[in-house]
Amino acid sequence: MKYILLSIIILSFTHVAIAQQSDTINKRSIIKRSILPVSLITIGSIISGSTFEKNLQTNLRNAVGNDYEFRIDDYLLFVPVAELYIADIVGAKSKNHWFDQTKYLLISNILTAGITHGLKFAVGKSRPNGGTHSFPSWHTTFAFTNATVVYNEFIDSSPALAYSGYLFSTTTGVFRMVNNKHWLSDVMVGAGIGILVTNLVY
């Protein structure tokens, strides 16, 4: 329950702060685009520390081998950023000029990093490998923040490119679990924060 309350409180403050900066935000659009990330945050918070989550992690590690480690997740989270600027270089039509893209990218990452690290220290959840500050996953938050910037920039002109960032961010989250660095709930909440905050920034 404390995970849910912390997530809701922090994200609510973020929502209010961003919403006050613009009178042109379409409230209906915000609600529609918030359904998925809020669901991820809520469900992730509910299953955090549950027997289901622990059994899932145990079964996953048994399937890949307890000594398995493939640190591709340390690199995949940057791919959406590379996609964004490569698309600009080759002349792909986007919603905003590269300068504004960079502005939204930085604002989104600063906000999501603050929220994620704030929750990490407030919650103090242990990682499946015995480490600390597990909830939520910063790698996943960062990856989904960047992927959501790509989505917002290219969804109207190039849907395939817009959705491609989520392929890399999802893979990042999966490998955080495969490498025994995070639980499912850490990944779900991290993804939800990245998507929600970035959509609010846009």
Annotate each predicted stretch with a short phrase.
Residues 84, 105-124, 162-174:
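Small-polar-interrupted transmembrane alpha-helices in polytopic inner-membrane proteins
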